Amino acid sequence: MDMKRRIHLELRNRTPAAVRELVLDNCKAMDGKIEGLTDEFVNLEFLSLISVGLFSVSDLPKLPKLKKLELSENRIFGGLDRLAEELPSLTHLNLSGNNLKDISTLEPLKRLDCLKSLDLFGCEVTNRSDYRETVFRLLPQLSYLDGYDREDQEAPDSDVEVDSVEEAPDSDGEVDGVDKEEEDEEGEDEEEEEDEDGEEEEDEDEEDEDEDEDVEGEDDEDEVSGEEEEFGHDGEVDEDEEDEDEDEDEEEEESGKGEKRKRETDDEGEDD
């Protein structure tokens, strides 16, 4: 991917003025030059151009707030005066793995008054026996060269690395180069996932309740069936008893009628 295209993607619908950090590592610099980077990036504090195939920084725009510049693993051999002209706030510069052969190529860096840390690992200039003493003498403002101070004491991390960009939102509502809208979207996604989990739990609870109700319903039906059977059985018994009672009543009535007839016959005999 070429550098222009990469910058366009990194903007993510932001304005250049809203960008504080820009990482363009491993993209392709056409003709070995910087492309697509303009002086509209007025608030840029960190720029990384590692292994992009740069031969020169002659097209670097003015970036008044840039503090850290990563240019390692390129093919830069000179033209560092451009850095002194366009980067007045630069504190950390990494030129490791470039084609810097002579101490004289570093002289333009004397004008970078804020420069505290310089890295030249893998550059041919480091092969000089008096390399460190010469560079510290040439650049008295330096605190650390290749991660060590003048007394060969290793630099603390806070000095080697640029402090993280403060997380205060800018005028566009962005934090650390990330759109506030993107953070909101992530929050919404998390809430949706929580809601889905809650709904699943509710569904499970409802299913359990339905199962319990079904079981209770079956028990009630069993009880009702038992009562009906018992009631039905009792009903049959009652009907049989009623039939027996009716038979007895009929027998009694017939017996009574027979006695009455007998008495009437006896009475007639007496009259005769």
Curated annotation (Swiss-Prot):
Modified residues (Phosphothreonine): T265
Entry keyword annotation includes Phosphoprotein: yes
Free-text description of this protein's post-translational modifications in UniProt: Some glutamate residues are glycylated by TTLL8. This modification occurs exclusively on glutamate residues and results in a glycine chain on the gamma-carboxyl group. Directly cleaved by caspase-3/CASP3.
Segments for region (Disordered): 149-272
Biased composition regions of type Basic and acidic residues, renumbered to the chain: 255-265
Subcellular location: Nucleus
Main subcellular localisation: nucleus
SMART domains associated with the record: LRRcap
Domain of life: Eukaryota
Keyword Phosphoprotein tagged: yes
One of the GO BP terms on file: nucleosome assembly
Protein role: Multifunctional protein that is involved in the regulation of many processes including cell proliferation, apoptosis, cell cycle progression or transcription. Regulates the proliferation of neuronal stem cells, differentiation of leukemic cells and progression from G1 to S phase of the cell cycle. As negative regulator of caspase-3-dependent apoptosis, may act as an antagonist of ANP32A in regulating tissue homeostasis. Exhibits histone chaperone properties, able to recruit histones to certain promoters, thus regulating the transcription of specific genes.
UniProt domain comment: Histone binding is mediated by the concave surface of the LRR region.
Protein name: Acidic leucine-rich nuclear phosphoprotein 32 family member B
Species of provenance: Mus musculus (Mouse)
The gene coding this protein: Anp32b
